[in-house]
Regions:
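Structural preference for solvent-exposed beta-strand-turn elements
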Residues: 1-363
């Protein structure tokens, strides 16, 4: 069994497929890659044991072919090839790779000494009979990866807040910060795992079909399919309370240059010590937003672009959280709402963020 294809095409496919590997040493399959040619359609498959990534290409010459290889070794070898074409040939328990030279990759075996067969959960998933079908845009997915991802809970494995709440809107939170994007994707809300959302970034087609059935969700576009399980715990997700916070009215608001405030925070960060717990003072003055380190060794005022219902207000806020949330914005100018004792709100188009203030004895 042998296949031959353009080196550039195989490199492109492998560079995408490798992103589906989690390389968990406790779960060997997460470090493997399936290579399958059926009816001239080549498919590379990888998994993290929950999500499966399929990268496909049609019109590939060769006999039907199926093999499972060590993903890292295969990926690194293919990336270093400079020949015009690459040939893959299965001989016994080895995969021959011919390009600039001839290389033999030893193939993994199961407990009975047979070549490993890669599971394919798509075989039992019938797109025609799924409960719900939707279509989303790749640009929307990439917007969510930019603005919502930084607000996910990354410190509590298994928490429902590690996932994206996707329904009438898209929400992410770690209880200290919230991000809500006013885009309706699904009629019935689900929690999408962060690993699955990350895999969608390898897609290149703008239109993506989404198929949801019980605890399974599949994203499919030209040449790429992502199969996985929804994150459990949606009944524990306090979406009503979170949405209420996003909709809070603040007495005052202003707008500032995104670049100007980020540059000021970057300079001020040099004067924030470990005992400050990343806290800085943010004061809304008549001239602009004053940013001050706790020891007053660094201070800077970012001028307003606009200001409405001004009233001087001071709070302590985590500089890392503030920087991360502002960096996620796309527009050059951001609107900041303030005046409540517990948090501030940042608005950028259809994106709303809430950042909780830090407790401080001086305030």
């Amino acid at each position: 069994m042998k296949i031959t294809l353009k080196t550039e095409k195989l490199q492109e496919m492998v560079s995408k497929a490798i992103k589906g590997c989690s390389n968990d040493k406790q779960i060997p399959i997460t470090g493997l890659m399936s290579i399958d040619l059926t009816d001239h359609r080549l498919t590379l498959t990888t998994t993290d044991a929950i999500n499966y990534l399929y990268i496909s290409e049609d019109k590939i010459d060769g006999e039907d072919f199926s093999v499972v290889v060590p993903a890292e070794t295969f990926s690194k070898l293919i990336s270093k090839m400079t020949s015009e074409n690459i040939s893959l040939a299965l001989t016994g328990n080895e995969l021959g790779v011919d390009g600039n030279g001839h290389y033999r990759i030893e193939l993994p075996l199961d407990e009975e000494g047979e070549l490993i067969k890669f599971p394919n959960p798509l075989d039992s998933f019938d797109i025609k009979t799924v409960a719900a079908k939707y279509e989303v845009n790749l640009t929307t997915i990439r917007q969510l990866l930019t603005v919502n991802k930084p607000a996910l809970d990354t410190n509590n494995d298994g928490s429902c807040y590690t996932g994206y709440y996707v329904g009438e809107s898209v929400v992410s939170t770690d209880s200290y910060k919230i991000c809500g994007t006013g885009i309706k994707l699904f009629d019935e809300p689900i929690l999408i795992r962060p690993e699955m959302m990350d895999l969608l970034d390898v897609m290149t087609s703008e239109k993506i079909g989404v198929y949801v059935d019980n605890d399974t969700v599949v994203f499919a576009s030209e040449g790429c399919v992502v199969y996985g399980k929804v994150l459990e715990g949606i009944s524990d997700y306090k979406i009503d309370a979170i949405s209420g916070l996003l909709e809070l009215d603040f007495p005052s608001e202003c707008s500032v240059s995104k670049d100007a405030i980020l540059q000021a925070l970057d300079r001020l960060a040099l004067f924030v010590g470990q005992y400050d717990k990343n806290g800085i003072y943010i004061t809304f003055t008549k001239d602009g937003i004053s940013l001050t380190s706790k020891k007053s060794s660094g201070a800077e005022v970012v001028p307003y672009k606009t200001s409405n219902n001004f009233k001087e207000f001071t709070a302590c806020i985590n500089i890392d959280m503030l920087q991360t949330q502002i960096k996620a914005h796309v527009l050059d100018e951001i609107k900041i709402c303030y005046g409540l004792d517990n948090a501030l709100k940042i608005i950028d188009g259809n994106v709303t963020q809430i950042i909780a203030y830090e407790e401080d004895d001086r305030l």
